[in-house]
């Protein structure tokens, strides 16, 4: 499950992780997340994989190693710094995105055949063209 936008939630819409929403799927779940979208550090090539099932984790680790993947130390430092020191910046970003959401939704209302879904998170909009 891709939860890369999990940090980009609006104040009235908290994120619910897939594992909390569907605990019965824990044994077959892989959750992927990263600070890259939130803090614009995609160039660091880092991410986090959450795998509750030890057997599945072992398979994942083996396959990951087979591709010669090793941890990116610089990316790990950037991620840690972003989460430790970036709260104020993230708050400002969310205020900015909230304003953009209002502007976009208002503009789309003028186009009769388009319907914008209520944005609960992220900077992406879902628009119904049908």
Predicted regions and their residues:
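Amphipathic alpha-helix from the class-I
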Residues: 54-59, 73-92, 129
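Short beta-strand segments
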Residues: 1-3, 33, 48, 118, ...
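Short beta-strand-to-turn element immediately C-terminal to the catalytic PLP-Schiff-base lysine
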Residues: 19-21, 47-53, 84
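Short amphipathic alpha-helical/adjacent loop interface patches that line ligand
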Residues: 1, 64, 94, 101
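Active-site C-terminal subdomain of aminotransferase-like
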Residues: 24, 51, 55-74
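Active-site pre-lysine segment of PLP-dependent enzymes
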Residues: 5-41
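Conserved glycine-rich beta-strand-loop-beta hairpin in the small C-terminal domain of fold type I
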Residues: 80, 89, 95-108, 115-129
């Amino acid at each position: 499950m891709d939860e890369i936008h999990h940090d980009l939630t609006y104040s009235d819409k908290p994120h619910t992780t897939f594992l909390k929403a569907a605990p019965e799927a824990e044994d077959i779940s892989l959750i992927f997340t990263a600070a890259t979208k939130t803090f614009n550090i995609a160039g660091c090539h880092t991410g986090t994989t959450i795998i509750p099932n030890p057997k599945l984790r072992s398979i994942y680790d083996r396959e990951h190693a087979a591709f010669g993947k090793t941890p990116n130390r610089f990316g790990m430092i950037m991620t840690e710094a972003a989460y430790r020191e970036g709260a104020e910046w993230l708050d400002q970003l969310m205020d900015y995105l909230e304003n953009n959401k209002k502007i976009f939704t208002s503009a789309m209302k003028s186009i009769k055949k388009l319907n914008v879904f209520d944005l609960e998170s992220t900077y992406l909009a879902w628009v119904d063209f049908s």
